[in-house]
Amino acid sequence: MLQPKRTKFRKVHKGRNRGIAVGTEVSFGTFGLKAIGRGRLTARQIEAARRAMTRAVKRQGKIWIRVFPDKPITEKPLEVRMGKGKGNVEYWVALIQPGKVLYEMDGVSEEIARHAFALAAAKLPMKTTFVTKTVM
């Protein structure tokens, strides 16, 4: 699963997921899966969607993952009283703003790409849409 090799700090503040997305255009492939909603993707969700797409295209074409989980999420163990410091890092997430391209695909037909992205979207906790590269 995806996670940073090393970070400056082990734990980070919760923060807020505001602002506008960076990376809103399809830049590597021909087709893309774009987030409509705001939220956060765990490393497990990113990997599950990638596997669903890879199986759908039968290992042909190329897939790019445009998001990376770089924010650690901590949890305290069950039945532990409040206080006594911040919990341990349990998983990593990527914060997603509306308009962010999550995955890109190339080397397959549009019909196959739409089917693969539909399978991937079912694994994700936010609304997404299918986009194609705009040629100017």
From Swiss-Prot:
An example Gene Ontology biological process: translation
Any one of the GO CC terms: cytosolic large ribosomal subunit
Disulfide bridges in this chain: none
MF terms in GO: rRNA binding; structural constituent of ribosome; tRNA binding
Domain of life: Bacteria
Pfam families per the UniProt record, alphabetical: Ribosomal_L16
Protein's UniProt keywords contain Metal-binding: no
Keywords, comma-separated and alphabetical: Ribonucleoprotein, Ribosomal protein, RNA-binding, rRNA-binding, tRNA-binding
Keyword tRNA-binding included in the entry's annotation: yes
Family under the similarity heading: Belongs to the universal ribosomal protein uL16 family.
HAMAP family: Ribosomal_uL16
Function, in words: Binds 23S rRNA and is also seen to make contacts with the A and possibly P site tRNAs.
Subunit note: Part of the 50S ribosomal subunit.
Descriptive protein name: Large ribosomal subunit protein uL16
Source species of the chain: Haemophilus ducreyi (strain 35000HP / ATCC 700724)
